[in-house]
Amino acid sequence: MPSAPDSPSLSVNVSGNVQKYSIKKKKVLNAEETELFELTQAAGVVIDQEVFKIIVDLLKMNVAPLAVFQTLKTMCAGQKVSETSTGDASSTSHTTAVPTESRVRSKMSSGQGEKSARESSSQRVPRQVSATRGQKSTKSSGSSSSSSQLTSN
């Protein structure tokens, strides 16, 4: 009988800790990141705020999106191994959730990859274009003179 009164106080303590954790968790993202996080949730992505924050921070530091994806994939692979040892039911539920997250990560990384490719190509294009323009102008003048020679022959 003494264990019954202890149970409610124990659950109150646990719920209090959960509330503290929830409050802490909400402070992880700034306003812009929170908006992005809410958009990902609206798109049907289930991801922890802290993981989302890590991904955003890495991408802000110009870490290659593919490297971020591979690191997360490796981390998830490690979780699958540990979850399998704990129980089949939990590993099954997490196994179904992980592909969704990896698809989202690949979408995010491909979107970021396109963005970084555009940025890097825009940075490279002036160098290549100037070199290409010089080659094209000599080729075009050379080809036009050769074509005029062909027509004159």
From Swiss-Prot:
The keyword Cytoplasm applies. It holds the Pfam family MOZART2. Residues 80-153 are annotated as: Disordered. Keywords: Cytoplasm, Cytoskeleton. Disulfide bonds: none annotated. Its main location: cytoplasm. Residues 81-99, 107-133 have a biased composition (Polar residues). InterPro entries: MOZART2. The keyword Cytoplasm applies. It is found in: Cytoplasm, Cytoskeleton, Microtubule organizing center, Centrosome; Cytoplasm, Cytoskeleton, Spindle. Residues 134-153 have a biased composition (Low complexity). Belongs to the MOZART2 family. This is Mitotic-spindle organizing protein 2. The lineage of its organism: Eukaryota, Metazoa, Chordata, Craniata, Vertebrata.
